[in-house]
Amino acid sequence: MASTLITNIGELVTNDPEAADDGRGLLGIVEQAALVIDGSTVAWVGRAADAPDADQLVDAGGRAVLPGFVDSHSHLVFAGDRAAEFAARMAGTPYAAGGIRTTVAATRAATDEQLTSHVARLVEEMRRQGTTTVEIKSGYGLTVHDEARSLAVARQFTEETTFLGAHVVPDGDPGEYVDLVTGPMLDAAREHARWIDVFCERGAFDADQARAILDAGAAAGLRGRLHANQLTYGEGVRLAAELGLVAVDHCTYLADEDVAALRDSGTIATLLPGVEFSTRQPYPDARRLLDAGVRVALASDCNPGSCFTSSIPLCIALAVREMGMTPAEAVHAATYRGAQALDRDGQHGIGALVPGRRADLAVLDAPSHVHLAYRPGVPLVRQTWVAGRPL
């Protein structure tokens, strides 16, 4: 298989886990750099002057190169949109339509082909903005058949599929619905999913219901995730820490004991600033979490209701401007920490440009990663590579 040398890289963000020990800082930056790709993996990284020969040569033109973004939280399998709801929210006027239930109805009415085409467009949109790995949830079907087919659609685009039958409590008996989620729905979904998720929030699923659903998922071989503490203080974050979940998402309203639980458990707090941007709600306090020693990831939460953006560069800019993160912390959170939030940061994983990792990368039309926050709204991703191939 042909090897490729990408040289004349002005700034190479490696996310080398050993970088902090040798003085290269959080991002493991190498200046005037090069990297060699062999097949789908990174084979060599270092100074351009020391680069070995390869079969093909690519000149980066002094641009910055960084690991592809890892979007560990999205809801891409849906039909229709809720633009009227967004416009009403921005105008501060009441909106009487059905919210998430509008999306559920449209998704159930769509064909598999329509859903697949829609997800393909969104994934391509993400790729153009540097995202190389995306997690995709179900959650707009809420029947045995529609949850299973939503996951089957998602599986065409990613291995990181998440069963979110516990997205909203339908009309009727909540206990009966939990039984449905943990029984027939889980049985139908498990073959298409790697993860199971619950929206643990006041007005949705409480901590006891979330625990029951996550326990059932674990018994079926699915790893647990959790939406928690988005709308108010609650038990969800502490439940995630108690269960040792790899990540818990939103984390907007946190008591001191929530922060301590995240720190002590090692559970990653995945922050979703696009939601707060799109809903005019308070942003999570990333600075507080980082200073407490909590691991923080960033993701898009791309969905038709609370956050219809697929742009990780926008999320990075918001995290820096509104949540107290440095540009380096935000880039690290959207790459390496995102990989950790999907438990994909191992020797042959993603989220870093070091030998043995998958060659997923973004080439910026800028000399430094700082420009992602410095120039918000500018399409800075010049080219995206996935598994060693340029798109």
Curated annotation (Swiss-Prot):
Which class of enzymes does this protein belong to?
hydrolase
Keywords tagged on the record: Cytoplasm, Histidine metabolism, Hydrolase, Iron, Metal-binding, Zinc
Residues annotated to bind 4-imidazolone-5-propanoate: R82, Y140, H167, Q230, S306
Give the cofactor note text: Binds 1 zinc or iron ion per subunit.
Where, by residue number, does Zn(2+) bind? H73, H75, H227, D301
User: What InterPro entries does its record include?
Assistant: Amidohydro-rel, HutI, Metal-dep_hydrolase_composite, Metal_Hydrolase
Q: Which family does it belong to?
A: Belongs to the metallo-dependent hydrolases superfamily. HutI family.
- Please give the name of this protein: Imidazolonepropionase
* Organism annotation: Nocardioides sp. (strain ATCC BAA-499 / JS614)
- Give the classification, highest ranks: Bacteria, Bacillati, Actinomycetota, Actinomycetes, Propionibacteriales
Q: Which gene encodes it?
A: hutI
